[in-house]
Amino acid sequence: MRTLFLIGLLALGEPALAAAPTRLTEPAVRDFVGRQSKAWNAGDLGRYFALFAPGATFTDQGRAKDGRVVPYGTSTLAEARAQTRRARAKSKVAETTLISRIEIAPDGRSARVVAGEQIVLTTAGRARHLCAERVQTLIATPAGLRSKGQTDTYGPCR
């Protein structure tokens, strides 16, 4: 019965089910990260946060001069949305994402993405340059690729 239901949905052109990849590929992962960056830089927070799974978490941390990682905090998806809205009300943010590594799981259903982030944060006409390493895990869902969240580790720009 469930099979007939799924076939019926596909016959009706249900885009959510049709969007789920059977195996992740590097080009699909790169495209996803590109869509994230485009939505973020356009300030389209609805589109940006729609690319995350409901249980996604967002962790910020810093790297001390001696190499230690210093945790700043972790937010839920709802908390990250609210924090981003507040921050963007005061500042303009532009990020450049440079993917350094993509590791696709053997089953092809998830991928770990490591990227460098070059960030320009402009507040009251003053620009600050920040750099971070971002690590996120992408998963294949019936709605397409989604991120389980991200960990940004801020450190010196090189």
Please give the residue ranges for each predicted region.
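Positively charged n-region of N-terminal signal peptides that target proteins for export
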Residues: 1-4
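N-terminal signal peptide c-region/cleavage motif recognized by signal peptidases
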Residues: 13-15
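Short, low-complexity N-terminal intrinsically disordered segments enriched in polar/charged residues
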Residues: 17-51, 74
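Hydrophobic pocket/interface hotspot
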Residues: 36, 48, 56, 80, ...
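A solvent-exposed, acidic/Ser-Thr-rich amphipathic alpha-helical stretch
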Residues: 50, 54-103
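A mature extracytoplasmic/lumenal domain signature
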Residues: 52-55, 62, 115-119, 136, ...
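Hydrophobic/aromatic beta-strand elements that line small-molecule binding cavities or substrate pockets
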Residues: 80, 97-103, 117-119, 133-140
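Short beta-strand edge/turn micro-motifs at domain boundaries
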Residues: 110-114, 124, 128-158
